[in-house]
Curated annotation (Swiss-Prot):
GO biological process, one term: tRNA modification
Function as written in the Swiss-Prot or TrEMBL entry: Catalyzes the transfer of a dimethylallyl group onto the adenine at position 37 in tRNAs that read codons beginning with uridine, leading to the formation of N6-(dimethylallyl)adenosine (i(6)A).
Superkingdom of source: Bacteria
UniProt name for this protein: tRNA dimethylallyltransferase
Entry's Gene Ontology molecular function annotations: ATP binding; tRNA dimethylallyltransferase activity
Span list, region Interaction with substrate tRNA: 35-38
Catalytic activity: adenosine(37) in tRNA + dimethylallyl diphosphate = N(6)-dimethylallyladenosine(37) in tRNA + diphosphate
Residues the record marks as site: Interaction with substrate tRNA: 101, 124
Pfam families for this protein: IPPT
């Protein structure tokens, strides 16, 4: 019998973390982070990582497991997440994956075989050199020209994934998005996939407010600590919230410009996340626009998940 898994996805700042904790309390669950940046130590504020005193006693997994310059891939996430699903289920608890990194979550839930993808080391090195000389945006424009679907899914600053998509196109003549569609889409688990959304104006307002809160909480100092350690070429510091402040530390933009760029990049990322989840996974959507209705939404979503997975719930 397939193991049961609840999944909470959606754009940044929509309230996934808070709902994940509430759902875990209702359904006897443990949270697995489905965020590719929250795995890194020392990157707490910029990744909106849940604080220990906010967890309300709910175990959280796949947080703070890597140093910022340690490599981490979707393949490793797939392995770790699946192992955790088995461990949590064996304890009689419900695994609840919470996050916004769609490809990572999809890879864990579905029968994806990444080892089948072709590779060309020399071509990869050439693309890395191109990125170093012309910048991440130039590399992303190249991907847009041959595979606009993958370009929409992959952030321009995620150089490693942009290169991987270009590499697959180079080796196969097929866009990476088309190659992925040829992969098995068999769901390995009995899953209830919940998506959180909000009206655009409300979501963008929350994003802007959260950036201001991050700045007040010490994001500049957090990013500066990474900068002062000489961490410049790591995948981690290309994340939204750090790349923009690195430009400020380098003197290329003012602090106000960096903060405005951070807000804009976060809003664009939220839009890409929504598009991806709507097109790639069988999601049951819930509107979280009215923050005053959070408790009612917790009840509604708990009932949906409990019904879908045939669980006994504390409702």
């Amino acid at each position: 019998m397939a193991e049961k898994v609840a999944v909470i996805v959606g754009p940044t700042a929509v309230g996934k973390t808070k709902l994940g904790i509430a759902l875990a309390k209702k359904l006897g669950g443990e949270v697995i982070s489905g965020d590719s940046m929250q795995i890194y130590k020392g990157m707490d504020i910029g990744t909106a990582k849940v604080k220990p005193d906010e967890m309300e006693g709910i175990p959280h997994h796949l947080l703070d497991i890597k140093e910022p310059c340690e490599p981490f891939s979707v393949v490793e996430f797939q392995r770790l997440c699946r192992a955790l699903i088995t461990e949590i289920s064996a304890r009689g608890r419900l695994p609840i994956i919470v996050g916004g990194t769609g490809l990572y979550i999809q890879a864990a839930l579905y029968d994806y075989q990444f080892s089948a993808a072709p590779s060309d080391e020399a071509y990869r090195r050439a693309l890395k050199q191109l990125a170093a000389e012309q910048g991440a945006e130039a590399l992303h424009r190249r991907l847009e020209a041959v595979d606009p679907i993958s370009a929409a899914r992959i952030h321009p600053h995620n150089i490693r994934r942009v290169i991987r998509a270009l590499e697959v196109y180079h080796c196969t003549g097929k866009p990476f998005s088309e190659w992925q569609q040829g992969q098995s889409k068999r769901l390995l688990y009995e899953a209830a996939i919940v998506g959180l959304t909000a009206e655009r104006e409300a979501l963008y307002r929350r994003i802007n407010e959260r950036v201001d809160e991050m700045i007040a909480a010490g994001l500049i100092e957090e990013a500066r600590a990474l900068y002062d350690r000489g961490l410049r070429d790591c995948q981690a510091v290309q994340a939204i919230g750090y790349k923009e402040l690195y430009d400020y530390f380098d003197g290329r933009v003012s602090l106000d410009e960096a903060i405005e760029q951070l807000k804009q990049n976060s809003r664009r990322y939220a839009k890409r996340q929504l598009t991806w989840f709507r097109n790639q996974m069988p999601v049951k959507w819930f509107d979280m626009t009215d923050a005053g209705q959070f408790a009612a939404k917790v009840e509604e979503i708990s009932r949906y998940v409990a019904g879908k997975l045939q669980l006994e719930a504390n409702i």
